[in-house]
């Protein structure tokens, strides 16, 4: 179930209260990862490199100059809650900032203004049983679009390459740096 209540921890909480087993992450992991700002702050505590960002709350404003000064261009402006890249804009010029903020506030009451980080996009899944934790090899995400937007995610505008085309050393580092701290804490 996409969005609320399936991805934000509510459904898991209901199942926990009724003692119904389920096969996805628990309440805490879902709640933290559904909120991009909270998730970023949480991961920073484990030394994970996170893009510089600003959080705007409904009714709060920011000037174009302040965005450029504090975050730089290009940047991403997106709702802090939610998924599927709804309300996300890759902003390249000052003139795009305010319309992108309005668009993001159309999806949520908090908006994240986040610096663009250039590089190879990776994702890495894992699951835990009573006996062990299994970590999958990193997958490289190569979008055909400007960024990994809704169209790329749901309409086949992406290549997902497993294992990722990165060095063995970088593969080991990514597994340690990303999967280890987060899997034990979430």
Residue spans for each PLM region:
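Conserved N-proximal alpha/beta basic substrate-recognition cap immediately N-terminal to
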Residues: 1-52, 57
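Short glycine-/acidic-enriched loop or helix-start segments at secondary-structure transitions
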Residues: 7-11, 86-87, 123
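Hydrophobic alpha-helix-in-membranes signature
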Residues: 20, 73, 78, 136-137
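Short, contiguous strand/loop micro-motifs
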Residues: 25-27, 87, 168-169
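Active-site nucleotide/adenylate-binding loops and adjacent lid/helix of ATP-dependent enzymes
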Residues: 32-120
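Phosphate-binding site of ATP-dependent enzymes
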Residues: 92-170
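Residue-level detector of conserved catalytic or cofactor/ligand-binding positions
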Residues: 174-186
């Amino acid at each position: 179930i996409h969005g609320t209540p399936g991805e934000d921890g509510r459904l898991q909480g209901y199942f926990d209260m009724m003692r119904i087993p389920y096969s996805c992450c628990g309440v805490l992991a879902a709640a933290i990862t559904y909120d991009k700002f909270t998730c970023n702050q949480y991961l920073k505590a484990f030394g994970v490199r996170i893009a510089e960002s600003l959080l705007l709350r409904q009714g709060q404003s920011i000037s174009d100059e302040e965005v450029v000064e504090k975050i730089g261009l290009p940047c991403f402006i997106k709702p802090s809650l939610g998924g599927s890249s709804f309300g996300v804009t890759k902003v390249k010029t000052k003139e795009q900032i305010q319309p992108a903020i309005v668009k993001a506030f159309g999806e949520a009451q908090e908006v994240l203004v986040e610096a663009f980080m250039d590089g190879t996009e990776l994702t890495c899944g894992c699951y835990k049983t009573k006996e062990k934790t299994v970590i999958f090899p990193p997958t490289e995400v190569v979008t055909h679009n400007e960024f990994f937007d809704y169209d790329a995610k749901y309409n086949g505008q992406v290549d997902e390459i497993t294992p990722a085309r990165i060095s063995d050393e970088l593969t080991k580092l990514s597994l340690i740096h990303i999967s280890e701290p987060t899997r034990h804490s979430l």
